[in-house]
């Protein structure tokens, strides 16, 4: 059980969080990630033809570059975005992982991983399709998934 203290002080000029822990562990890291994600975008604007849609980021399974356009893929729709993948990556919460030059996946939609003989990771996603990681991102993927 973690102890929580809240101190309200009108003399403070800004809000801040201090974390006191005997050591760094997964629980502490998840708190840090949650706090960092507070400033991240939780919705995006996507397009289907001439329709404009507000997309809940947590519904997105993967962001892929398709025909030079960034596409957000949910379980039932594909939305074109006007952002570049590197811009999007900066705005997304911590549970999105860059797996290649052209794709970012939501780690909560990863069902299983298969290590290929060529060193790549085949990621099976919960929408019944799979994708491959790039070797360039392999170290980062393993760190983010704690494998």
Curated annotation (Swiss-Prot):
InterPro entries: LytR-like, LytTR_DNA-bd_dom. GO terms for cellular component: cytoplasm. Residues 44-147 form the HTH LytTR-type domain. Keywords: Cytoplasm, DNA-binding, Transcription, Transcription regulation. The keyword Chaperone does not apply. Pfam families: LytTR (PF04397). Signal peptide: none annotated. It comes from the Bacteria. Its main location: cytoplasm. It is found in: Cytoplasm. GO terms for molecular function: DNA binding; phosphorelay response regulator activity. This is Uncharacterized HTH-type transcriptional regulator SAS2254. It comes from Staphylococcus aureus (strain MSSA476).
């Amino acid at each position: 059980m973690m102890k929580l203290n809240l101190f309200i002080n009108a003399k403070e000029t800004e809000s801040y969080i201090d974390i006191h822990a005997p050591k760094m562990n997964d629980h502490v890291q998840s708190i840090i990630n949650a706090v960092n994600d507070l400033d991240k975008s939780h919705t995006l604007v996507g397009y289907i033809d001439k329709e404009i849609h507000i997309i809940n980021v947590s519904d997105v399974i993967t962001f892929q570059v398709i025909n030079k356009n960034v596409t957000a893929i949910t379980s039932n729709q594909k939305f074109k975005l006007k952002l570049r993948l590197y811009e999007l990556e900066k705005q997304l919460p911590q549970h999105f992982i860059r797996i290649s030059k052209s794709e970012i996946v939501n780690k909560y939609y990863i069902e299983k991983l298969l290590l290929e003989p060529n060193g790549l990771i085949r990621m099976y996603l919960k929408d019944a399709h799979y994708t491959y990681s790039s070797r360039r991102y392999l170290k980062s993927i393993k760190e983010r998934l704690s494998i």
